[in-house]
Amino acid sequence: MLFRSGTFSIALTHRYQFEGGTVADPTNWDGGQVEISTNNGASWDLIGGAVYDGAINGASGNPLQGEQAFVGTSTGYPATMVDTINLGTAYANQTVRLRFSVGTDSAAGAAGWELHSLALTGAGTPFATLAPQNTSCSPTAPLVFTDGFE
């Protein structure tokens, strides 16, 4: 994605239910994060800061242990909610990639993380030009069936 100058933000409509983070089990065993790359995915930086609920337990065996993440159960679950990550101008005029990661320990889990929609503000046009469709499907091509399926 190419971003023009100005502020860049990501609005996630999502819901999550990760193991832990409850009154009965206050330890955050699992969680989800949003990461960004400016070098085509060679390395990734954690973004999100204040939108996260807490840190993943540091002794859980989770690959994200000790890091901030969406943990526990989202507000109003199973309804979706919107969290906005404002990155300001830190990525202006750069091509970036976004990655959504879930880290878990090896024990029992919960429902997980569902991303319903994603809205980017401050993003440039993802494609400079649109290419016309030069071919079409052939409705008269022979059909091939295998394994007795006809």
Outline where the language-model segments fall:
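Beta-sandwich/jellyroll recognition modules and their flexible linkers
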Residues: 1-150
